[in-house]
Structures are given as C-alpha cells and as structure tokens.
C-alpha cells in the first residue's frame, strides 16, 4: 500500500475528485483513503490503540474528531469516518511526505493503481498501461519519474 498507488493532496477537493471520477472512473461516493503519519492522524481522527496495526493497511475506519476540519476533507465518508492509512517511518510514502512538507501537504489521498474494474497493477508494465489509458500525466517508479509524453512517444 503506497507502492502501487494513485496519490494526490488529500485535502485538495478538486484533486481528489479528479482522481476518483476522471482517473479511476468510479462513483463519487467511494472516497479514497487518507494516508498520513501517526502524529497527523491523531490530530484529526479518534484512533483506537487496540487496532493500530489495522491503520497501516487501511483495514479499519475511524471517526473524525468532532469539530476537526477533517470532517470536511474529501477523503471523509458521509458518516464522518475515514479508512485511514498511517504510513510507517522510512517508507516510501513517509519519504514522499517529507518532500511535500514545504508545500504544506501532510495528507495524501491514496487509491490503488488501477482503473475501475481492473485488477491492481502488478508491475511497471501494468503501471505504464494505466498511465497510457488514463489522463495521468506522470508515473513515479523505481526507475524515476516518468512523464506520459515520454511514455507514449
């Protein structure tokens, strides 16, 4: 989770809507998962310590803290919950969040790298196919950041 993902700024409603409806081609009532570090998660969500490990794999929902701005995040379900992902220290997403800190991005909307109805991408070739078949402009891979214009030429 995070190695084969579609991600964008988790607080940017337009970006999350674009990811969900245009790229993923799925219903707007299916929100993406907010991925963040533990210290950010505890500011916005009521975490249950007994299921902490479930938050690492987006396996549990939690409620937004009452009065918190998280209730207005585009990754929040209509019932005021979110299926959060707490990223592990030194993971790829943790390193990416470090790079995004100067832009004040502390939460990423995270969704599986696939198009509605297709299985999740397995390898680089699958990822390239999703990039070609969708309006994605970039694909971040183990070999670097690939621009769609260079993939299709």
Segments and roles (model prediction):
Residues 1-153:
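Flexible beta->alpha loop and helix N-cap segments adjacent to enzyme active/binding sites
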């Amino acid at each position: 989770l995070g190695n084969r993902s579609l991600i964008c700024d988790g607080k940017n409603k337009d970006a999350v809507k674009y990811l969900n409806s245009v790229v993923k081609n799925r219903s707007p009532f299916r929100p993406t998962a907010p991925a963040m570090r533990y210290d950010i998660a505890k500011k916005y969500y009521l975490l249950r310590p007994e299921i902490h490990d479930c938050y690492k794999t987006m396996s549990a929902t939690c409620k937004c803290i009452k009065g918190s701005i998280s209730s207005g995040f585009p990754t929040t379900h209509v019932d005021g919950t979110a299926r959060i992902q707490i990223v592990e220290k030194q993971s790829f997403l943790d390193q990416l969040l470090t790079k995004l800190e100067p832009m004040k991005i502390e939460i990423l909307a995270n969704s599986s790298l696939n198009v509605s109805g297709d299985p999740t991408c397995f390898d680089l070739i699958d990822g390239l196919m999703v990039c070609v078949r969708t309006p994605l402009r970039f694909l971040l891979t183990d070999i670097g950041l690939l621009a769609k214009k260079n993939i299709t030429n």
